[in-house]
């Protein structure tokens, strides 16, 4: 049973079972991963008291959750779904910034690697449908979420589908969160979602799209990158931080109207 602890920040995202082939053709099979894990690991040196909010099914290894607890994370917000869903992810890295996610059999064979039996039946197209599982999980204090998770002052949402992020924002607004940051999902970073994005950004302090996501969202409303960032900021968030891979970041501060180009 996860131990109760004092927490200052919540991070919400996915926990996944990853199968990775790196640029040198080396495989890393059945590894604990996911947006929640990577974000929490990056935040840990700066924020010690972190609560994790996610969902897993019954096949998710209990020892992975135990390791997170031993690292000092509060895992009481990780909810087990009674319905199984696709937790596996496959990444075949072509270079430091680009990877392929489908046809794992081809990539294992190409690199002369034995195919892991745990990856049998994996199809990339199953993931988007299974992400909707979030929408079927009741996340509230009445349904087992620790009250302390609503008493924090800050929260970050990792990439999740639109309806899930809206659901989590509504949940956090019922508590004491006053600093909310968001990393978007490809699912809604499209031009048809521009007007709906206000629902998510109205109370956010910072928004972290990739350059590709920003262009996909804003290309019908703006042409220049800084103009796109200003358009996003007008939807309610103060800081728009565009992630550009190895090229670093762009940041627009709507409060001061200042622009920054930052190295990696």
Where in the sequence are the language-model features?
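A short beta-strand/loop micro-motif in the catalytic core of glycosyltransferases
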Residues: 204-211
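Conserved phosphate-binding/catalytic region of the ribokinase-like
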Residues: 2-7, 154, 171-174, 225-264
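Alpha-helix C-terminal capping segments
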Residues: 41-49
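Conserved N-terminal subdomain of the carbohydrate kinase-like
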Residues: 4-6, 17-26, 30, 48-154
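Short, hydrophobic/glycine-enriched beta-strand segments
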Residues: 6-16, 181
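Short catalytic helix/loop segments, enriched in acidic residues and glycine
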Residues: 25-41
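A short acidic, amphipathic alpha-helical/loop segment
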Residues: 64, 164-172, 195-199
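Glycosyltransferases and closely related glycan-assembly transferases
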Residues: 147-150, 166-179
């Amino acid at each position: 049973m996860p131990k109760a602890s004092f927490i200052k920040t919540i991070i919400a995202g996915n926990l996944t079972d990853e199968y990775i082939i790196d640029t040198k053709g080396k495989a890393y099979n059945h590894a604990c991963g996911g947006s929640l894990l990577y974000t929490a690991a990056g935040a840990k040196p700066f924020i010690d008291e972190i609560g994790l909010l996610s969902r897993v099914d019954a096949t998710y290894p209990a020892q992975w959750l135990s390791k997170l607890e031993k690292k000092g994370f509060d895992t009481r917000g990780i909810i087990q779904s009674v319905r199984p869903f696709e937790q596996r992810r496959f990444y075949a890295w072509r270079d430091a910034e680009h990877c392929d996610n489908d046809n794992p059999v081809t990539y294992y064979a190409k690199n002369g690697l034995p195919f892991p039996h745990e990856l049998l039946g994996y199809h990339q197209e199953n993931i988007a449908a299974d992400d909707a599982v979030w929408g079927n999980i009741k996340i509230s204090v009445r349904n087992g979420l620790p009250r302390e998770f609503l008493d924090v002052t800050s929260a970050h949402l990792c990439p999740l589908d639109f309806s899930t992020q809206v659901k989590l924002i509504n949940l956090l607004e019922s508590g004491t969160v006053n600093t909310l940051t968001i990393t978007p999902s490809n699912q809604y970073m499209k031009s048809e979602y521009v007007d709906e994005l206000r629902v998510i950004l109205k109370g956010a302090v910072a928004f972290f799209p990739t350059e590709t996501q920003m262009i996909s969202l804003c290309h019908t409303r703006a042409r220049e990158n800084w103009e796109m960032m200003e358009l996003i900021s007008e939807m309610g968030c103060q800081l728009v931080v565009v992630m550009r891979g190895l090229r670093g970041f762009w940041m627009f501060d709507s409060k001061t109207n200042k622009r920054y180009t930052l190295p990696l």
